Amino acid sequence: MALFSPRVDLALKIAAVGHSGQVRKGTELPYIAHPVHVARLLEQAGLPEPVVIAGILHDVLEDLEPDDAAARARFRAVFPFLAGVADDAIGFRAGLTAYLVERFGDETMALVEAVTEQKEIDGRSRAWIERKREAIAHLQHARTEILALKAADVLHNVQSICQDIDAAGPEIMQRFNASPDQTLWYYRSVADVCGRRLTGPASGLAHELDEAVGALAVALAGHFNPLTTNRSDSSRE
């Protein structure tokens, strides 16, 4: 991939605006660090530009809260093309999605949508465990590019958690709504699917993910009792 790509540059700008003011859970680290790391992992693994861009954009739509009028205002202030888009949450999301398809193509947006969790159905908030089981089920039949994107996403999350545990201890797991054993179950499940199904040069991501999840399991061993840390299935991130 070229050292500079106008498409990658635009994707970074959109992600920076979309994640403005957001931080990584339990930290003061700007959230934009996550999609940038995910994109870098994908690039290093040899994935093509559409997949790298999907890594940059993978959380933009998922994290666009329906009642976040301020986020919609930020998008309009930076991107004049959104001036004519409806201001209601549904209309704005549809307009932004249409623009992303126009600028980055169906392939990139199909990848983004494949890893975007549906947090609500008919106005009902979905339980954490329900969403994660669905995500794992989708991976069982996903194509290589989707598996690579998911592996890079989870790999950076696990690496970040391990670094935070090294710095501040396993107590940092309390920042998550899911219990430590639920979190580890989900990451292990993703690693197992990717390990079985991700082939070619991108299989290195699956190997790194497997090692990272193993390191997380070691870091958490003996610190949490599954019988007391399990939370209800309504746990959400």
Residue ranges, per PLM feature:
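Active-site helical microenvironments for divalent-metal-assisted chemistry
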Residues: 1-237
